[in-house]
């Protein structure tokens, strides 16, 4: 949750972190027909029923890197079709936030720096790769996007 209070020419942001399992919002990627609820947490139980906001990353609408993960064989199956300049919308109780895809990359599972804090409002999508691999996938497919609002 984000609480904002204005004063003079500045805004102070006070974050109240959601608890694991809380509804964060909905992520939509219209060109590839993705529309899925996002819950707080990226543990296996959460990812069975929704996409998950990676705990410790920024919340939508704040400065920093918002991390969202989902399984490649369910909700994020179409993410392999994503392209630069595709639009991603995150709808939350605190607003609608639009992001434009900058780039995609494939990384090792331990390359968690893709979720590091950033000085700009960004979004990082994470799913396993290859998309049609049988078993535990050896890589991660990463989508980087920048907030447009």
Model feature map: region roles:
Residues 1-149:
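Solvent-exposed, non-transmembrane regions of membrane-associated and secreted proteins
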């Amino acid at each position: 949750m984000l609480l904002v209070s204005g004063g003079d020419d500045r805004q102070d942001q006070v974050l109240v972190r959601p608890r694991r399992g809380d509804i964060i919002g909905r992520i939509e990627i219209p060109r590839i027909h993705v529309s899925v609820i996002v819950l707080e947490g990226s543990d296996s139980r959460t990812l069975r029923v929704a996409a998950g906001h990676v705990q410790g990353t920024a919340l939508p609408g704040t400065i920093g890197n918002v991390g969202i993960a989902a399984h490649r064989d369910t909700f994020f199956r179409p993410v392999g079709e994503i392209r630069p300049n595709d639009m991603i919308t995150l709808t939350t109780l605190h607003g609608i936030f639009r992001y434009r895809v900058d780039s995609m990359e494939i990384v090792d599972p331990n390359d968690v720096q893709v979720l590091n804090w950033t000085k700009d409002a960004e979004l990082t999508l994470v799913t396993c790769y290859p998309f049609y691999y049988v078993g535990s996938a050896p890589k991660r497919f990463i989508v980087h996007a920048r907030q447009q609002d």
